[in-house]
Amino acid sequence: MSAEEMVQIRLEDRCYPVSKSKLIEQSDYFRALYRSGMREAVRPEVGPEVQQLRGLSAPGLRLVLDFINAGGAREGWGLSEDELAEASVLSEMVEAASFLQVTALLRLLLSHVRLGNCLELYRLAQVYGLPDLQDACLRFMVLRFHQVLCQPQFPLLLSPPQAPGDCSLKQRLREARMRGTPVLVALGDFLGGPLAPHPYQGEPPSMLRYEETTERWFPLANNLPPDLVNVRGYGSAILDNYLFIVGGYRITSQEISAAHSYNPITNEWLQVASMNQKRSNFKLVAVNSKLYAIGGQAVSNVECYNPEQDAWNFVAPLPNPLAEFSACECKGKIYVIGGYTTRDRNMNILQYCPSADLWTLFETCDVHIRKQQMVSVEETIYIVGGCLHELGPNRRSSQSEDMLTVQSYNTVTRQWLYLKENTSKSGLNLTCALHNDGIYIMSRDVTLSTSLEHRVFLKYNIFADSWEAFRRFPAFGHNLLISSLYLPNKAET
């Protein structure tokens, strides 16, 4: 059997031996060179021919030739995961692989995109015109958007859009996280009940998803982290299709400052930076790509979380500590309504401007409300549930505090509308989420006499101003939260 023919690749004053057959097999550059009959090789009187290369780095060329000598196999290549995360190694290797057109190596990189190298690989894919690698990096960065934002290299890629209508990389990633299917997800301490279509085995799940076509709830293939079990009075908000659960208190009455985020695209929980202040019974609001933790039990300060730094910083505090209030974002501002000050009912609507870091008195109300939930659509705030106490001369008599109502407040016209009420459903301790064309509400049926909190599930249609009742929620439970998240389409998982 004849010995394998070798070729020497010369770069400056160094030579690297490589199998000629493997070189032709793996490198489109050399395959074209040999097939065209071109002769750039120097053939000495004794020994293998020598191919001269210029302009490449020695470390990058060595890595590519090692890959070629390994027959294009990852197992025999010898490059570690740590080396694949080093920017200098990647830069020199991709440069050499692109020049020599070693497509198998470039294709291999598609499956080795990691948090430590995704930004550098994305940059290199742009430089060397590698669309498949660029797409692989974009997909990875969409999956782990907030973790990628924290990377120190990320700001270096944020070049301004080249033409009107173009989006920055950050905006493209943010929008791509919303391309799945909007799904209602419920979290809580579920105590039992016949989960459709089959009862669960063992411990009850702590996360459920709602399938609208069948009107059934199914266990989500994940559970709350142990640190979140038995936590009450926490703040929750959706930011960039992450569900944040922040603060609260344990059943031992100890307040906490911990923060966690659930990524529905990867179905993972991550712990993020803790707040500076332990707080419970506060409001967490997402606005302008940041989170604001507002007030709390006997607390007036406000903290802002920036996912790009994974850090909380204090901003302008509330004018006064508030209890049993609610807050939401509307057109880039935060509105706080209802509750109590340390001395009296809070009849003021407070507005916070993030850019000015300033709280102002927006308007004074004739109706006092507490323990309500709030969501917004365009310039309209919807107030769901809570306890109403009308103070004006036209107030209604014999009004039950514990019934489900929906009101709206237009922040432009400053007009209140009393939209709908449901006297058989409780307006207290409910949870709701804006989802598609309505507000989905998990409430309690006040006509049932039971010690268990059996929840009812209904929807207020914003456009039709009507209630729509669904099949009874399939589990008893408490400490429930309902949210609307984008889950990946089945074809993409």
From Swiss-Prot:
Sequence ranges of the Kelch repeats: 183-241, 242-289, 291-332, 334-379, 381-436, 438-487
GO-annotated molecular function: ubiquitin-protein transferase activity
GO biological process: cell division; proteasome-mediated ubiquitin-dependent protein catabolic process; protein polyubiquitination; regulation of microtubule-based process
Keyword terms: Cell cycle, Cell division, Cytoplasm, Cytoskeleton, Kelch repeat, Mitosis, Repeat, Ubl conjugation pathway
Pathway: Protein modification; protein ubiquitination
One Pfam family in the UniProt entry: Kelch_1
Subunit structure: Component of the BCR(KLHL42) E3 ubiquitin ligase complex, at least composed of CUL3 and KLHL42. Interacts (via the BTB domain) with CUL3. Interacts (via the kelch domains) with KATNA1.
InterPro entries membership: BTB/POZ_dom, Kelch-BTB_domain-containing, Kelch-typ_b-propeller, Kelch_1, KLHL42_BACK, SKP1/BTB/POZ_sf
UniProt cross-references to CDD domains, sorted A to Z: BACK_KLHL42_KLHDC5 (cd18478), BTB_POZ_KLHL42 (cd18319)
Gene3D superfamilies according to UniProt: Kelch-type beta propeller (2.120.10.80), Potassium Channel Kv1.1, Chain A (3.30.710.10)
Biological role stated in the UniProt entry: Substrate-specific adapter of a BCR (BTB-CUL3-RBX1) E3 ubiquitin-protein ligase complex required for mitotic progression and cytokinesis. The BCR(KLHL42) E3 ubiquitin ligase complex mediates the ubiquitination and subsequent degradation of KATNA1. Involved in microtubule dynamics throughout mitosis.
Domain BTB: 5-77
Official protein name in the record: Kelch-like protein 42
